[in-house]
């Protein structure tokens, strides 16, 4: 199970990476989440400009097995979505790279640091 050390994680199996500008973050689903979902066939996300509250639903992932809600890992404004998601299988093949989901202008960068670190996330999923 791939759990990069430089990311932060939620109990809902999303990851967050604060970008170098310190106010924007990328977010996606974890390797664990994509493996549990199975083959992802479609991703639906709210539009850029949407204000997000932490833990609020911001989209859905449709897999062969199921449809799952996506929860905002942090509060902020959704400022971008990954255009590569037209080929939704990229979430399965590269969940931490090309398969990122959204870019968020964060309300509070410190909130990212309050999320789970890699060791805590490993413990959560029993890895």
Curated annotation (Swiss-Prot):
Entry keyword annotation includes Acetylation: no
Co-factor(s): (R)-lipoate
UniProt-listed SUPFAM superfamilies: Single hybrid motif (SSF51230)
Subunit-level organization: The glycine cleavage system is composed of four proteins: P, T, L and H.
NCBIfam families: gcvH, PRK01202.1
Function text: The glycine cleavage system catalyzes the degradation of glycine. The H protein shuttles the methylamine group of glycine from the P protein to the T protein.
Protein's recorded name: Glycine cleavage system H protein
Organism taxonomic ancestry: Bacteria, Pseudomonadati, Chlorobiota, Chlorobiia, Chlorobiales
């Amino acid at each position: 199970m791939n759990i990069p050390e430089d990311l932060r994680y939620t109990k809902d199996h999303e990851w967050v990476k604060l970008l170098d500008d310190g106010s924007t973050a990328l977010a996606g689903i974890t390797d664990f989440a994509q493996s549990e979902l199975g083959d992802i066939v479609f991703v639906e996300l709210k539009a850029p400009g949407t204000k997000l509250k932490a833990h609020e639903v911001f989209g859905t992932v449709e897999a062969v097995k199921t449809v799952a809600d996506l929860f905002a890992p942090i509060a902020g404004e959704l400022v971008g979505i990954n255009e590569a998601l037209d080929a939704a299988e990229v979430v399965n093949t590269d969940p931490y790279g090309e398969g990122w989901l959204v870019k968020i202008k964060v309300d509070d960068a410190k909130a990212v640091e309050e999320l789970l670190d890699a060791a805590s996330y490993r413990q959560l999923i029993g890895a």
